Amino acid sequence: MQTKGGQTWARRALLLGILWATAHLPLSGTSLPQRLPRATGNSTQCVISPSSEFPEGFFTRQERRDGGIIIYFLIIVYMFMAISIVCDEYFLPSLEIISESLGLSQDVAGTTFMAAGSSAPELVTAFLGVFITKGDIGISTILGSAIYNLLGICAACGLLSNTVSTLSCWPLFRDCAAYTISAAAVLGIIYDNQVYWYEGALLLLIYGLYVLVLCFDIKINQYIIKKCSPCCACLAKAMERSEQQPLMGWEDEGQPFIRRQSRTDSGIFYEDSGYSQLSISLHGLSQVSEDPPSVFNMPEADLKRIFWVLSLPIITLLFLTTPDCRKKFWKNYFVITFFMSAIWISAFTYILVWMVTITGETLEIPDTVMGLTLLAAGTSIPDTIASVLVARKGKGDMAMSNIVGSNVFDMLCLGIPWFIKTAFINGSAPAEVNSRGLTYITISLNISIIFLFLAVHFNGWKLDRKLGIVCLLSYLGLATLSVLYELGIIGNNKIRGCGG
């Protein structure tokens, strides 16, 4: 219990630390342009501030510039912490029980319900971007977090893990191919700055085909290995490892774990009779007990107590409004847990997007840039922690599957709101996408996918610090170019606010 509690508080401490560093990314060494026009063809037009779709807030623009902006930064960090708590403690456990009740296989469960747990903030942000702000913050958050997931999380796994993990070829190839197709589809959709109903349906179809492939993953894997292994050394080695290595195993400490043959983002596994339930989720490895400790138990360490006190209002609010389905008494109420936690995620994400939008407007940073930096890294914090934890245990395939595979669900996060708005709300009229810079970002994303696969290949299919350094430098380079393009420093994509 103490080990699990220590990991939980360490995860939240890491969350706050990374968020604090990320919050300063757009400001370091950058001279912001002053309300310049965005070029669109032969004319220029201003971009209406998304903050007009939100309440006015509790400070004027001048008060925010005089120091009130710090309050907004603190609220942003606190909302990230709240989303992390509700996902870890309520949303994911309810999704696991739903998958168990429906009898879903680990592949289907991992790419549907379980992937929804990790991508819930991105999904809500996409809905807010389409229906509330009517801007690009949802799209840029998903595309920005995708680049971070591919290169940033891989860099964290390589640099923070003392174990060199051997990777399998097929799962990485499968997920990279699926995401390359998805990203290429998004590029084609947003290229003309309009999204039609059939284009939103196309993204849903791609995701459905991906789930269908996972349903027959074993047969497809065996067929491809049989056909391609004579000419592909990595596939031949993958076949040898799959024959030698069982799915379930035991660590030196006597604790059961899932071996790297598990190639999905997450899944639910049961040991033979006489053993406890073992659950692997997108937020890490944890031994699930029937009756977890009370959320009101104060940690012993001083630093943990500080974080516990800071999060106590959120803990109390969730405790009073959402049943904890991890406990035996509330297990049958998992549907209520699912809907209540989804409501709270939506509420916290709304406040988060509101604060980030006003912060970006105060600092004269476009909403797309904020989505590429603060929102992108923040919504991927749980994935970062989960991947680093499994990489430290030598389970490289599981870490890479979390890195690449979960991004496919993010395409669904764009397809659902686009399809609903264009097919049922706008009367078949297209939805407008205002940012030409997103085209550049999507191209960068496709390049990063190909680069990651080639980097792993030339590194000998190993997840180590050498790969981590290469991915880190690549991510910093792509992120810098994307931000400079959105700011108008490079290219012809300068932005100004209407009425400014």
UniProtKB/Swiss-Prot annotation:
GO-annotated biological processes: calcium ion import; calcium ion transmembrane transport; intracellular calcium ion homeostasis; melanin biosynthetic process; monoatomic ion transmembrane transport; monoatomic ion transport; negative regulation of melanin biosynthetic process
Keyword Ion transport carried by entry: yes
Membrane-side (Extracellular) residue stretches: 30-66, 133-136, 191-195, 324-333, 390-399, 459-468
Disulfide bonds: none
Annotated transmembrane regions: 67-87, 112-132, 137-157, 170-190, 196-216, 303-323, 334-354, 369-389, 400-420, 438-458, 469-489
InterPro entries linked to this entry: K/Na/Ca-exchanger, NaCa_Exmemb, NCX_ion-bd_dom_sf
Residues on Cytoplasmic side: 88-111, 158-169, 217-302, 355-368, 421-437, 490-500
Result of changing residue 111 to A: Greatly reduced exchange activity
Main subcellular location of this protein, as a coarse class: Golgi
Signal peptide from the UniProt entry: 1-29
Alphabetical list of Gene3D superfamilies matching this protein: NCX, central ion-binding region
Membrane-topology annotation of the record: Multi-pass membrane protein
This protein's UniProt keywords: Albinism, Antiport, Calcium, Calcium transport, Golgi apparatus, Ion transport, Membrane, Potassium, Potassium transport, Sensory transduction, Signal, Sodium, Sodium transport, Symport, Transmembrane, Transmembrane helix, Transport
Catalytic activity: Ca(2+)(out) + K(+)(out) + 4 Na(+)(in) = Ca(2+)(in) + K(+)(in) + 4 Na(+)(out)
Subcellular location: Golgi apparatus, trans-Golgi network membrane; Melanosome
GO molecular function, one term: symporter activity
Highest rank taxon of the organism: Eukaryota
GO cellular component, one term: trans-Golgi network membrane
Record carries keyword Iron: no
General function of this protein: Calcium, potassium:sodium antiporter that transports 1 Ca(2+) and 1 K(+) to the melanosome in exchange for 4 cytoplasmic Na(+). Involved in pigmentation, possibly by participating in ion transport in melanosomes. Predominant sodium-calcium exchanger in melanocytes.
Disease: Albinism, oculocutaneous, 6: A disorder characterized by a reduction or complete loss of melanin in the skin, hair and eyes. Patients show reduced or lacking pigmentation often accompanied by eye symptoms such as photophobia, strabismus, moderate to severe visual impairment, and nystagmus.
Recorded family membership: Belongs to the Ca(2+):cation antiporter (CaCA) (TC 2.A.19) family. SLC24A subfamily.
Protein name: Sodium/potassium/calcium exchanger 5
Annotated organism of origin: Homo sapiens
